[in-house]
Amino acid sequence: MDPAWDGSQGSRPGTASIRVRELSWQGLNNPHPQNKRLGSHGDIHRERWVEERLSPARLQALAQVDDLQLVRVLEMCVDTRKNSLGNFGLYLPNLIQLKLNHSYLGSLRDLGTSLGHLQVLWLARCGLTDLDGIGSFLELKELYVSYNNISDLSPLCLLEQLEVLDLEGNNVEDLGQMRYLQLCPRLAMLTLEGNLVCLKPDPGPSNKAPQGYNYRAEVKKLIPQLHVLDEVPTTCTSAPAPQTLSQDWLMVKEAIKEGSVLDILLPRLDDPHGATIRKFDPTLPVPETQPWALSLLVPGGPLPEGLLSENPATEDHASNLTHGPGQVLCGNPTKGLRKRRNQYQEWAPLEQMPPHRPDLAIRPSTPRPDPAESCDLAMTGLRAWTEPGLRPLLQRQLEFQQERSAQVQAQDPQKDPVEQEDQTGPKTSLTPPRLVSELSRTSGFHLIPSPPKYPMPPESGISSLGRSADLPFRGRRLRVLGSLGPSLGEGSVLGERLAAVTALRALEASSGPSHRAQGCPDPKPALGPAACPPGLHCLHHLNPIPPAHSLP
């Protein structure tokens, strides 16, 4: 409010009025931030953030000193893509040697600008592509940047105190880059081995050095103050042996750069097991490292055993609705579960066939020798279809047997199917326990006639009998069987006899060739319920179908 305003001047205008409304706030109006307990989520997050920034407390704990001014040598391995070093040089004013080998640095600027007293710097295999920012280390005397991707040496001209420079395994390919090192008056030792400039003076398509090229003599001319070149005194200017850029040499160079062979177990900032930065004691043993397999370094090489799981794509039918974002469930989940259950019940028995599961492709098999000895061409085709490895489900066999009975009865309606069975010869066989249990488990709900879910047997043996009238008899085979009521009896007698005939034919088809096909007739088995295996008693619940008025 305006302090010069008083009541003698009248009421204030409405536009200048101030209204204050008190809210029904039960707590303090201006509460102070609460200090979270140690171990809470926020405190952990704050400590992690402090660790990433290398706070003074963190440096004291890692260097195991109370006074950071006593730290002169520090060795650590960092990844600046995940952790920020900040301006940690402010807390280490007397740091002289810093070793960051095997780290990842996007640029030298990640080290800050407060390391002006640093004299020795190791940056081997740090993924550096340039030396921008090296000018902030004005007192640097030794620089080791081997096995990086450095090709430009111009930033080094600012280092007047530089004495030792290691450029082994970099990408220096132009001899003119050596002119920048002329501005380093104290440079005495230089390592250039592993650079293209050692093979040819300038970049070009050829991998061979020009005739008479001697890089040692050329470097000595450009850097006269140099004393040692590639660990050999510069007074020895004899031409080295001719060298060529071989594929093996390039592969070894790149492998060293990537750190796949000579990786040492240095602690990292993101190490969850404790100290992430520490000062190494030279007397402590360094743990040996297990080198990677050579196949991991060579492109296209085989992977070592155990690296991949034996069955990475195992299908789990109990959770195929939750396979991640690759499969989206739309609509009613209840209907989806029912559909999945029906599909699994339909295909699971076929997948559980142990010997021949990989070979699920349907192939026509060869009939057994001498098929002419069989009196029934349809049974010959059925035996060829039920070869081991291609045998379909028991339900498929039951449907085929019922269809065959309907075809024969359609040709001679006055003939009893049991008498036809007597003429063709009785067939008995022992049923494996697995088939009996499978029949007893599935016969309660698989006896509804439906189109077959699998291809029919090959047409070589039954084309003249079954294929001409396949579709008409498929839809009304049970009705034709129901029309046989007067000849077979009424009520439960018909159901028992039909069940016995169907069971015997199914057992014959599932166990291979019959005795009659091999020329050995067997005595006629009993057709009563006692003769059937225990797993087949549920077949007696079949009720006869009322006879049709007329045959189609």
From Swiss-Prot:
Any one annotated GO CC term: cilium
Stored Pfam families: LRR_4
Chief site of localization: other
PROSITE patterns, per the entry: LRR
LRR repeat extents: 94-115, 117-138, 139-160, 161-182, 186-206
InterPro entries reported for this sequence: Leu-rich_rpt (IPR001611), Leu-rich_rpt_4 (IPR025875), LRR_dom_sf (IPR032675), LRRC56 (IPR040091)
Region (Disordered) location: 348-375, 401-435
Localization per record: Cell projection, Cilium
Record's keyword terms, sorted: Cell projection, Cilium, Cilium biogenesis/degradation, Leucine-rich repeat, Repeat
UniProt GO BP: cell projection organization
Top-rank lineage group of the source organism: Eukaryota
Family assignment from sequence similarity: Belongs to the LRRC56 family.
Purpose of the protein: Required for the assembly of dynein arms.
Assembly description: Interacts with IFT88.
Protein name, as recorded: Leucine-rich repeat-containing protein 56
Organism: Mus musculus
Phylogenetic classification of the source organism: Eukaryota, Metazoa, Chordata, Craniata, Vertebrata
